[in-house]
């Protein structure tokens, strides 16, 4: 793992237990939180929609079977991947061990702005959504 991804993971883990304001582009939103954690590692996650923002940042899609610490999992609409609609969610993978995936996420439950971790996580997107794993350079 690169030092940048380790720094991003460390920033996310240090944020667990904090709560932030929510609303469009507020620090408690899941995507804004993941962007903040990646930036702590010097990883650029530019602005855009749920799909195009990753592509514009140089991230590439990888399969769930290849997920690694530092990857980002994005729930996106299966019908309109670049739409900001209810059900979109973003998490940072902080560890993978023996088939178990650890993540840090913000704003779950929605509207809470709460940052939490989960040590045995697997994607469970809502109906009509899919989970996409993105790997950033750096």
Q: Across the structure, where does each feature detected by a protein language model lie?
A:
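Aromatic- and glycine-rich peptidoglycan recognition patches
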Residues: 3, 20, 87-138
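Secreted/periplasmic proteins that engage bacterial cell-wall peptidoglycan
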Residues: 2-80
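Active-site loop architecture of trypsin-fold serine endopeptidases
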Residues: 80-86
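Long, domain-scale functional regions
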Residues: 59, 86-87
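Generic structural signal for beta-strand residues in well-ordered domains
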Residues: 65-66, 84, 96
């Amino acid at each position: 793992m690169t030092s940048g991804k380790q720094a991003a993971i460390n920033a996310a883990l240090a944020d667990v237990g904090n709560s932030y304001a929510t609303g469009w582009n507020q620090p408690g939103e899941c995507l804004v939180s993941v962007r903040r954690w990646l930036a702590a590692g010097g990883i650029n996650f530019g602005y855009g929609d749920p799909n195009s923002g990753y592509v514009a940042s140089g991230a590439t899609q990888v399969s769930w079977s290849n997920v690694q610490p530092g990857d980002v999992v994005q729930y996106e609409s299966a019908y309109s991947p670049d739409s900001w609609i209810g059900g979109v969610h973003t998490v940072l993978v902080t560890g993978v061990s023996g088939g178990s995936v650890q993540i840090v996420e913000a704003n779950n439950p929605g509207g809470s702005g709460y940052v939490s971790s989960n040590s045995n996580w697997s994607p469970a997107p809502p109906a009509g959504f899919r989970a996409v794993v993105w790997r950033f350079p750096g």
